[in-house]
Amino acid sequence: MNENNDITLTLRELWGKANPLWERRYEDFITTHTDYSVGTSKYLDSRGKVFGAGYEIYIVAFFLGLYANRRKPMTKDTSKKRKFGQPVGYWGQIEARGLRQPYPRIQDYIFAALFAKTNVDLIALDKGEIPAAQVISQMKQTMEEYANFGFSYMTEKLEENPDYFFKEGAFLKLFLPFLETAEECVEGPESLD
């Protein structure tokens, strides 16, 4: 394994220990659609929720921001921020229940997207001029800002229509406007004629 792979592996492992923040103003939205803050003894009370753990809706919020290519800075007030109980390295590693299967590869997809979208000076990192912890902090900030846009976008939809998320496929339909934009961008090269 060459030195660059060692750096990437180390970054991946360090990033797995990160626990991204989210703004408290989205807590009602998160608890409405997830089992977040619901103990296992209350599992039956949480029927009808689309997502299990709170981080699952965070993943959706992150990908909304990523697909829209929009970031929204977090509030600087730390009292208005929260984090989920599990670091990213545990996301998607739930046990299989019924039709539900673990999905740990999501971590790899998120990491790859963050690595591509975060302005990291790999040469400075390789030379030891910047610590890996600084790179992880930058990647975590990128993730938080994409997710913050995603949460903002979802709550806007909720304000427009309070029943929006109680319709089949509502969370998937959130991505459609951004997918159409992406398809327009890859139509092909401009003619040189």
Predicted regions and their residues:
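Charged, low-complexity intrinsically disordered terminal regions and linker tails
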Residues: 1-45, 71-193
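Short, basic amphipathic alpha-helical segments that act as recognition/interaction helices
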Residues: 41-75
